[in-house]
């Protein structure tokens, strides 16, 4: 039996083509998997900053904007509302916002960058209910100074989102990161991002 010479060049081509087809097959399997695991355009947009024009917002008005699937409240406060805030300090659990759940620029009596605009997450810090905006003094009871009232368990917050003493909510309403460009509010970007 005589052995025929083996053509090594053909064998190398077959091995190279087999490897190439294997890599293409692997890429074909990995692409849909990676596409499935990456967030969609809608999800990326939902997590990004939200721009809100506040130029037409009237004093006393509240707007609700959805950011990252949560309601964000924007309230335009009157000068009287702002002037009343210091008089409530003795009735509040954390009047100076020492418990850290807001950006440093919101650690003031107004809990805001601009005193006339309050920006809060509209989620009660007790069990995640949605408090209602009740700005009129006396709207909940005779001693009510105006603010936010959570009807789930009775938590009360003033017009800076600060919780009153002896309420089920353990902390003030949260302040999301935000900044202003004139009368445009940008929720999701800190003042430091400017």
How should each PLM-predicted stretch be described?
Residues 2-21:
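N-terminal secretory signal peptides and thylakoid transit peptides that target proteins
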């Amino acid at each position: 039996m005589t052995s025929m010479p083996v053509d090594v060049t053909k064998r190398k081509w077959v091995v190279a083509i087999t490897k190439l087809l294997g890599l293409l097959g692997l890429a074909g399997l990995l692409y849909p998997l990676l596409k499935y695991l990456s967030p969609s355009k809608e999800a990326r947009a939902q997590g990004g900053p939200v721009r809100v024009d506040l130029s037409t917002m009237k004093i006393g008005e509240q707007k609700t904007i959805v950011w990252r699937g949560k309601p964000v409240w924007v309230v335009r406060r009157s000068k009287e509302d702002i002037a009343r805030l210091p008089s409530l300090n003795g009735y509040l659990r954390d009047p100076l916002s020492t418990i850290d759940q807001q950006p440093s620029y919101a650690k003031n009596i107004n809990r805001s960058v601009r005193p006339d605009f309050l920006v809060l997450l509209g989620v009660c810090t007790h069990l995640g209910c949605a408090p209602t905006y009740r700005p009129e003094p006396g709207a909940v009871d005779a001693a009510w100074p105006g603010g936010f009232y959570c009807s789930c368990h009775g938590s009360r917050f003033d017009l800076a989102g600060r919780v009153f003493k002896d309420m089920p909510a353990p902390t003030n309403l949260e302040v999301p990161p935000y900044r202003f460009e004139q009368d445009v509010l940008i929720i999701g970007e800190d003042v430091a991002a400017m």
